[in-house]
């Protein structure tokens, strides 16, 4: 079957850096044990499972602060999504060793909020409710940051039209953000705009927008919790007009989606392991609706192939 490998796709530099830092921590026997990740280092269950094999425990909970309250000793790794200053303070009070894997793009947004909130600015922050990145950003200045996910959320805000900054979560759909920002500027014409869609998110979305129309269907390989993966499927359907399905790995691919297709596009989120995506691509390339021997969708990627290799520090 004809497969269009939509590029760029897969890991971004922030994800790779975060995973390398966590793997180096696992190899560093001088670090206090246990080793914990507050949440998922990146939003991919395969990565979480692989780190468990490395001896790193990924903790889950309603938010980072509640998770941390249950940690009494050891080392904590802050995920690529960033954490609030309150989380950092509590970790320090508990005497925990901290490793910060926050993506530099997220750190830049935190710095903006911190600096401008001190000057009295209010923030309209476009992001996804319940996602850890907005949680961390809002925690920088809780009284100054107003989370907006939809146009309805925006309309319900009542802010003075002065000293306002409009910014956003780094992994949102750039088209959704643009629409909400446009309306926000109509409501608050004196506001400053700081568009923080990260470059990796932007170029992956643009690639889908430009290339998906060549395909009958698009498969996005990514975790259900991965906002950037879900947005890629959204871009395919809403911008390119091509039906799209998000799958965690090959085992979630349904053959009825592709059996009538002449060309299938495949892309993947910024936190999706390359071997997981390659397995999907190889399967679809070899798939023949008339040959049952090509229908096996069992995932076969070994867990030791999931994480990037790192050099052992001497």
Swiss-Prot record:
Q: Which amino acids does the record list as binding (2E)-4-hydroxy-3-methylbut-2-enyl diphosphate? A: 43, 81, 131, 170, 226, 228, 271
Q: Name one Pfam family in it.
A: LYTB
**EC main group:** oxidoreductase
Q: State a single Gene Ontology molecular function.
A: 4 iron, 4 sulfur cluster binding
> What HAMAP family would the database entry show?
IspH
Q: In which pathway does it act?
A: Isoprenoid biosynthesis; dimethylallyl diphosphate biosynthesis; dimethylallyl diphosphate from (2E)-4-hydroxy-3-methylbutenyl diphosphate: step 1/1; Isoprenoid biosynthesis; isopentenyl diphosphate biosynthesis via DXP pathway; isopentenyl diphosphate from 1-deoxy-D-xylulose 5-phosphate: step 6/6
Catalytic reaction(s) noted: isopentenyl diphosphate + 2 oxidized [2Fe-2S]-[ferredoxin] + H2O = (2E)-4-hydroxy-3-methylbut-2-enyl diphosphate + 2 reduced [2Fe-2S]-[ferredoxin] + 2 H(+); dimethylallyl diphosphate + 2 oxidized [2Fe-2S]-[ferredoxin] + H2O = (2E)-4-hydroxy-3-methylbut-2-enyl diphosphate + 2 reduced [2Fe-2S]-[ferredoxin] + 2 H(+)
What is the similarity comment for this entry? Belongs to the IspH family.
Q: Could you tell me which InterPro entries the record lists for this protein?
A: LytB/IspH
Q: Which residues form a coiled coil?
A: none
Which annotated residues bind dimethylallyl diphosphate?
A: 43, 81, 131, 226, 228, 271
Active-site residue list: 133 (proton donor)
Q: How is the cofactor bound?
A: Binds 1 [4Fe-4S] cluster per subunit.
Q: Which cofactor does it need?
A: [4Fe-4S] cluster
What gene is this protein translated from?
A: ispH
| Role of this protein | Catalyzes the conversion of 1-hydroxy-2-methyl-2-(E)-butenyl 4-diphosphate (HMBPP) into a mixture of isopentenyl diphosphate (IPP) and dimethylallyl diphosphate (DMAPP). Acts in the terminal step of the DOXP/MEP pathway for isoprenoid precursor biosynthesis.
- Its name, as the record gives it, is 4-hydroxy-3-methylbut-2-enyl diphosphate reductase
Q: Which UniProt keywords apply?
A: 4Fe-4S, Iron, Iron-sulfur, Isoprene biosynthesis, Metal-binding, Oxidoreductase
Q: What is its EC number?
A: 1.17.7.4
GO BP terms:
dimethylallyl diphosphate biosynthetic process; isopentenyl diphosphate biosynthetic process, methylerythritol 4-phosphate pathway; terpenoid biosynthetic process
